[in-house]
Amino acid sequence: MATLKVQAREVLLPVVVVDKHGALVTNLAAKDFTLTEDGRPQTIKSFASQSNLPFRLGLLVDTSHSVYTAMDSERKAAGKFVDLMLPTDPATGTPAEGSSSPGSKAVAQGDEAFLIHFDHEVELLEDFTNSRDKLHHELDAMTPTSQEHSNQGPENNGDDHSGNGGYGHGGREGGGTQLYDAIYLASDELMKPKSGRKALVIFSDGADRGSKETLNDAIDAADRANVQVFTIYFKGEEERSNGFPGNGGHHGGMGGGGYPGGGGGWPGGGGGNRGPNPRSEAGVDGKKIMQQIASRTGGLFFEAKKKDNLDEIYNLIANSLRQQYLLTYTPDKVDTEGGFHKVVLKTEKSDLTVITREGYYAPVADK
């Protein structure tokens, strides 16, 4: 379950609770929950609905041709999300226009975000910054990577390391949609060294083509970095070798994932294997992939069946992040070997759904 190591042995869980209609529930207390680690009851040490811990956010945007028709809507919606999550300009102290919302909380010192786009390469467009202007500039300028080196590989269901070798000019070079590599690199290289509350927001069709990392590698990296992953699935159309794809469907909403209804030369690495990799007979089921990424990391899954509802989805993500509970506990057993520990958080209220991570990795003791 979603964790950040605040102290050597203290575990922190960001927790979202929703009712049967998918509405956020924000009036619960520690007494409403039961917590276990590896099947053993644990004592909740602290429980709060808001925190001064800084937010570290990462926007990961699929710029492959399969989702190209939604790019303009995605730029605008992601820009508004940046204003919601970083509402105070660091230079002037003035709020962004339209940045207030029912769920918004005061910004903690140190709140910052970065932007990555991925297609046949993974490219860091803007490193961690608290500047809305820098993020808006890169979002507005964001385009698919030049196709000079593109060699669209087969869809990757996460079972093996498929794709083409080498590192790209702005990141990894290879197939057509390096989703797993983007998650891995964002988690391992950017998020892992940071403290505070950490979340990735991913916009994609979920069909990986060409990544070196597997689906489990990507999720494992997010777990090790204590990162929640929120996913936005937009189907688009299958990529074609001659031109851009067509449209994707009509209005949609939320579901699955536990929710009712430049950096060239980034290194690779291995990961764990704690779950299956869903695929349909026709190939990878991108929707199931995006649902699994969200559910296994304590985030939420959303489906944008219509590009015009991206604003609504980003607003829901912002509210979920700002209104989540933060729970801490000290495990009853000490693990100095860096093992994975399964965490289960439940509430006695049967009409509510608790959303948090599957578990956490214990810190390895210094030799």
Where are these regions (language model features)?
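Scaffold/interface architecture of coatomer-like assemblies
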Residues: 1-367
